[in-house]
Amino acid sequence: MCSVTQRIKSVKQPRGGFINPRQLDVESDLYERPRYPQEDENINAGLIGITTDYLTRYLFGTPIEVAFSVSIEGMRRLGKSPLSLLNKINGLDNKSISAAIKLASYDCVVRNGITAAMHHAPEKANQSTCENIRTMVTTSRDFLFAYGPVIESGIGFPGGYTDVVTSGDGDYLTANGLWDMKVSKRAPTKDHTLQLLMYWLMGSHSSLNYKYANVEKLGIYNPRLGSVFSVEIDSLSKETLHQVEVDVIGYKEKDALF
C-alpha cells in the first residue's frame, strides 16, 4: 500500500526509463522565466512548487477550498483553523502569496504524516520569492489557456487504485492531454515521466475512464524553465504500457487494457 510517488521509488525501471525523457518533445522558453535566481529565494523549493500549483488552480477558477484542500485537511488534522490564511489569499500580491505558502506548508501533514511537533511554519517569504511565484503562476495560467480547455484539476482516480498503489492525484486534465506541473530548474526525469504514465493508466482504469478517451499526450509544464515537455501516447509500445499496468501499478493480467 503506497502512493504513486512512493511506488516509483521502489521500482527498478529499464535503462533510460519506461518513458525515456529523451523521447519528450520539448518546447523551450515558451514563457517568461522567473526574474530572480532560485538561490535568492528563502523558501524550500518543494513548497514553492506546491504553492505555485495551488495558486494557479485557484486563480484559474477552482474554488480556493478545493485548490488547497490537502493543505486545509493538514491544518485540521493538527487542530488548526485555515480560515485566517484562506481569507488573506485574494490574488498575487505579496500578502496573498505569503499566506498561500503558509497554508501549503501543511500539505506534508497529509502526504507524509508530519506531526504537530515536526511541522515548522515557513519564514516570511522575501521579495525574490514572491516575485518568482507571481511570475510562475502567471505563466502557468497562460500555459493552461493555450493548451486547454482544462476539464479538471487535482485529479483523483476512483476505482483505479490497486492493492499496490492506493493513492495519488494528477494535476491537470485537458481535452486531449494529461499534464503535470513540475517547478524545477532541471528538465524532467524518468521518474516524472513514469508518474504521468501511471496517472493516465489509472485514469483509464478508473470509474471516470470516459474522461481519458480522447487523451492523446502526456506532458509536463515547468514554469521555472518556461518550457513544455510532452510525448504522444501512440508512440509508447503496448509492451511498456502492459508492464507498467501489471508490474508497477498492480492490475491483474485479466484486467489489463494493453
Regions found by a protein language model. Name each.
Residues R186-L196:
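Active-site-adjacent loop/helix micro-motif of nuclease/hydrolase catalytic cores
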Residues D163-S167, Y212-A213:
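Short solvent-exposed loop/turn micro-motifs enriched in small/polar/acidic residues
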Residues G170-K185:
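Conserved catalytic cores of phosphodiester-cleaving nucleases, focusing on short active-site segments
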Residues T115-A125, K211-P223:
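Short alpha-helical "patches" and their helix-cap loops
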Residues N132-G148, W200-S207, V248, K252-D255:
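Hydrophobic, Leu/Ile/Phe/Ala-enriched alpha-helical segments that form helix-helix packing faces
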Residues M1-V165:
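Metal-dependent nuclease catalytic cores that hydrolyze phosphodiester bonds in DNA/RNA
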